[in-house]
Structures are given as structure tokens and as C-alpha cells.
Amino acid sequence: MLVAKSSFLHCTGLLCAFVLMGALSSCGKKATPSMPPQPLDFSTVLQYAQRAAFAYEQDATIQKQSGTDVKVSISGPVSSGMKAYVEVNEAKRVQWIVVRGTSSLVNIRSDVDYNKVVDSRLGIPLHKGFADAAVQVYQFAKPLLKTDYETRVTGHSYGGAAAVIVFMLLKEDGFKLGQAMTFGQPKVTNRDGVRKYRALPLLRFVNAKDPVPSLPPFELFAVLDEGPYLHFGSEVVLEEGAKYRYYSEHPSELSSVFSFWDNLKNLSIQDVPEHLMATYLARVQQNVPSASGK
């Protein structure tokens, strides 16, 4: 599935400096918040967030929380300690792939290289660690799915990144795609991947002070090879309280993301409360209209 790509570009120090300055200048452009094409239905968003949170529970809890009207199949551990489950509702002809993240943030950094790794099927550069995990999840999930059922995908953190690549594979295999929503998802590809898959129905949720969705950050080797990692899909930035900002594209990076990147090896997800799935779930719940119509 994954094949090697042979070359890595080198340049003189002067050329490197000019490329670096130009790239940083382009990365500094700020996207402007806008109105979403249609009002966000946070009751629906909550269905995705709850499933992404369930994925961290024990298998018995996942089965219980999912209810008796659906069939749930849970994977064993996959790459980097991740796990996934598939939920199929025969009556509604809807199926879900839910991918759990990992407790370690260092995997985002240690498997970052994409300049030598291209997925031969999708035809785009991908983050090696996320791609490896996605392939394992897809191998587990595909035999459990029906191509004519609406297929929804969700995940948090590393799991969200793998879920996006799974969504790409579903498209290539002709599945009927529903909505994909991710929470705190890092970047998975570059400009080539963005061009090819930007039309996918992907909505990314980002807590306002969560640095993880800005990873991997701008890296000189990426600018000189396939270009920097980029996001695609609309982005919803969740503030504290019932407030959010909608962007049709990824806004500029957090200024602190580079020092955060350098310190990843010393951090766990618990050290970054804005990145916790529990925090995402709480922010989504704050935006769900109450029964009183508030």
C-alpha cells in the first residue's frame, strides 16, 4: 500500500532563506470567519462527538451506550494503541466508523515523514503514521460495511486524522458518503491531497486554544519537497460557552505551535486540557439548543 519516494531536494543556504521567508509570509495570512452555508445543527454534531468520546471507553460500555437497535463491532488495538468500532443501523441504513485516538502525542512527531512515503492507491503524500493506522482501521471496517448505506466517520486527535484517510478510501471504493466530523484533528496531507479531496463532506472542530490541529507545523524540509502539511474541510473553532467561529478554510497557526512541537516528546494528552475529547464534548453540548428553545 505504501511505496517509497526516492528524492529529497537540497539547496544552498541563500535559497533556503528565501524559500523559508516566502513560506512563512504565506502561512501568516489570516482566514476570515464567515457564516456557514447553512446553520450548524449541534444536535447532529453531538451525535458525532458522543461517539468519538465512546471510543475511549471499555468495549462493554461502547456496546451499552450504542443501544440495542444497532450492531456494533469493535476492533482490537491497531497502530500506536488506537482502536476503532463500526456501528450499523439496518433500519436507518446508516453506518459509522469511529476511530479512537492515542494517549501519546509523540506519535504525531515520530511518524511525521511524508516526503518519502506516498499512498499508491490514493496517489497523494500522507503522514506515514496516520496512513498506517488508517489502513489497519479500513481493513477491519470494510468487510462490515455496505456500499449503499450512508457512511459516517468520526474520530478525535490521532484517531480523527486516521478517520479522514479512511474517508478518502471509502470514496475511492464507491461507498455512499455521509458527513465526516473530526475533533482536534492534526493535518494529514499536503496541497496535492487538499486539491484532490477538498470536496469531501468534512467538518473539523477545533477548540480555540488547542495546538494539536496546527500540527505538524511548517517545516523547512516540507517546503523544499512536497510542501507543508495543510488542512482541508471547513473548520469550526469552539470557544468557551455557546460560542463558535466558522471558517471555510483553516485559519493561521497558533504562534506557540513551534515550541509545542519541540516539546511533544515530554507531553501526554492529559497535559493539554484543550485537546481532551471531554473538553470537545462539553463545548459541543454548550451549543446544543435546550428544550426551552434557548
What are these regions (language model features)?
Residues 23-26:
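C-terminal motif of bacterial Sec signal peptides marking the signal peptidase cleavage site
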